[in-house]
Amino acid sequence: MSYKRKETGKLGEELAAEYLKGMGYRIIQTNCRLPEGEIDIVGQDGECLAFIEVRTKRRLEYGLPAESITLRKKAHLIASAESYMQKYHLEHLPCRIDFVSVDLSQPEPKLELIKNALGEE
């Protein structure tokens, strides 16, 4: 991954964390690395544990940020969330996978939250 892409991703994750806090989420962990993959943000929304995938784009020629999530990435997100729950003995908690789309193509960043993006809880 190029330096510019890493910097764009890092900026997007920082903006997303602040955005989520403003929406009432409590940020538990960022950039959580597991054997199955990385979880960008682990947060709590009320009683629900949320595993948040952040997608950031500076240009929209190839689609919106959320459209860049492949079936393979979805499978990794599910496996990573399950692994996290087991590792920290949190299987009893309700959980979901959310997406935050960060559009940096305009002067002001545009963020959008998609709760329960995979439709499973």
Curated annotation (Swiss-Prot):
InterPro entries: Restrct_endonuc-II-like, tRNA_endonuc-like_dom_sf, UPF0102_YraN-like
GO molecular function terms noted in the UniProt entry: nucleic acid binding
Lineage: superkingdom: Bacteria
Coiled coil residues, start to end: none
Pfam family, one: UPF0102
Family, as annotated: Belongs to the UPF0102 family.
Protein name: UPF0102 protein DET0781
